[in-house]
Amino acid sequence: MTSQKFGGDWTAKKLNIFTSYLDAYLIALQNQKFKKIYIDAFAGSGKTVLPDGSAVDGSALLSLQYNFDEYYFLEIDPNRKNELEYIVQNRFSEKTNKVHIINDNCNNRLGSILKKLTVYQRGVMFLDPYALELDWSILSDASKTGILDIWYLFPVNALTRNLPK
């Protein structure tokens, strides 16, 4: 199995901030009867190699340490999807019936996932693409559900590179 080599020194900080948010989010909902959903549209293999060579759990695996009722992980690369499935089955076997790992482009699949959501659910959607890969209509549709907290991280250099000069 191989780990993804994306990110930089900020990756560990970003993941720490995100897990602190998940802590607070689930505390806020602990006495609510909502079904809690987690969606990671760029789930990867589950592991990320930092610049110092150390491997850390990525957002998908970190989310499994939290008590959501359902998890949706999308990954376009079949090898990364298979690695994520392997790790989930071996480290989080008690949650496999709650986890949906989908091998597809998020732009093709997120719409159908969003249509399944109801007012009796609350969720977190984590969007951390490698470039500007997300169709804006998907982001718009996700925001219109009114039930998702959306984390959309994008590389500013990819955005500025596409601006008119």
PLM regions with names:
Residues 1-165:
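Class I S-adenosyl-L-methionine-dependent methyltransferase catalytic core
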